[in-house]
Amino acid sequence: MVTGTIKNKVDKIWTDIWAGGITNPLTVIEQLTYLMFIRSLDEKELATEDFENMAGEKMEHIFPASAAGQSMRWSRFKDKDSREIFLTMQQRVFPAIKKMKYGRLPDFDANGELVEIADDPTRPDEGNTAFARYMDDAMFLIPTPQVLQKIITGLEDLYTHDIADLDMQGDLYEYMLGKLATAGQNGQFRTPKHIRDMMVELVQPTPDDFICDPACGTAGFLVSSAQYLRAHYEDSMTPEQWQHFAGPMFTGFDTDRTMLRISAMNLMLHSITNPEIDYKDSVSKQNSICSKYTVCLANPPFKGTVDAESINDDLKAVTNTKKTELLFLALFLRMLKTGGRCACIVPDGVLFGSSKAHQSIRKELIENHQLRAVISMPSGVFKPYAGVSTAVLVFTKTGAGGTDRVWFYDMKADGFSLDDKRTEVKENDIPDIIARFHNLDAETDRKRTEQSFFVPKEEIAANGYDLSINKYKETEYVPVEYPSTTEILADLHELEMEITKGLAELEEMV
């Protein structure tokens, strides 16, 4: 848990960076991410040295043994003069981590020139983390030695006094990511953690699943899945399942390399060291993945449109459109194995849009697969990022139908106020949603006037496959009795007399 003390220390670091001239929150997080990664390399090196001393067995090291190589270690430069730290970072550490290979940093020659690690065709690049793979175009943007020293001092204080384990590092990074308060150009924005956690609870991943978010952003859904697995299976997972957990279980795609670095770091801080984090336009022809994953969790971009020529033909065959929110639904169905589960967020327009593309994707979900639930969320859920109304769709890929009825739930509260402040409140439907969804047999007799209810497939089909809850929800109107016209007029006359009397009294006083 991130305490108030930790938040204050992070906010202080943030303020120091802003004062130094970096005001874009994404750039701030990116620069902090680099420093956290650099520190983590030294921690791994220290662990390797401890093991060597205990076991007497020689291990491969991250840092070169030369003076230049050892000078790149966090523990060696953190207490130096600010100008020396800045030069070390600028001239050695940063160039070296951009050329990291096989889990090792390159060395420098006598002239201070970087000596790249030679390719070894017999050895795959398994030593590099997903984060290191996306460092080649990274830029060191911290402007001055003084700002860098303040950041390093602040981070070192956090790690020394407040961050006890990997879980705390992950929570700290989540708090930093919470400062990303602006949506991207393609309509992507960060999904609140409690909404992600709810969606993970709905699909209930297992240690043998293959989980994918094809629009991963900061990898929030993958992190929430990892946290769910550790909470429910940590004591029973086999060594093979832990190996699966550390890498191939989790896949994320994005078209923003900065986001790929941030997502890889987020996963690394949650014990997932080698996930499949790839630069990929998921709905384009470059992505041909089919029937590979058992779980998809996503909040795909809403406002984005893509070049019609680049869209994968398989997706256009299901819904012929350029709208990303529709294309991603077709993508989930293609990428899932038969029996795979998906929970995804869609804008309300997907539920009731009347275009052929809108209707065709809804028909595909209902007629050819099993659409299990439509959970309508209030428009304030994504504030302050966006005020768009959204819903969560939960479905299973079958390829053979299976939708006999669809469960609808009208979420009215999510535990936070629905204004820009999003302060914590008592009202919260999420525990109720999870409990009802996992006991749908008890929902059969609910009336349309209640917060959740079933709608048969035939009725949905007859309404153009409309999935908006208001199409089927019934409202009980309580009759209100108003006073008669005679009574209202009598009250008005009485009021007029009181006003006249009051005016007369005022005139006498003048």
Predicted regions and their residues:
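Non-catalytic, mostly N-terminal accessory regions of nucleic-acid modification and defense proteins
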Residues: 1-202, 206-207, 275-287, 376-380, ...
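Short, contiguous acidic/charged loop-to-helix segments that flank catalytic cores in large enzymes
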Residues: 23, 307-324, 348-357, 378-385, ...
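Conserved Class I SAM-dependent methyltransferase catalytic core
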Residues: 28, 255-262, 322-395
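A generic secondary-structure signal for well-formed alpha-helical elements
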Residues: 39-45, 180, 219, 229, ...
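Conserved S-adenosyl-L-methionine
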Residues: 188-298, 303-307, 314, 322, ...
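A generic structural signal for well-ordered coil/turn residues at beta-strand boundaries
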Residues: 246, 292, 296, 388-389, ...
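Hydrophobic alpha-helix feature that most strongly marks membrane-spanning transmembrane helices
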Residues: 268, 301, 337, 341, ...
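C-terminal, active-site-flanking charged/polar segments
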Residues: 370-371, 383-433
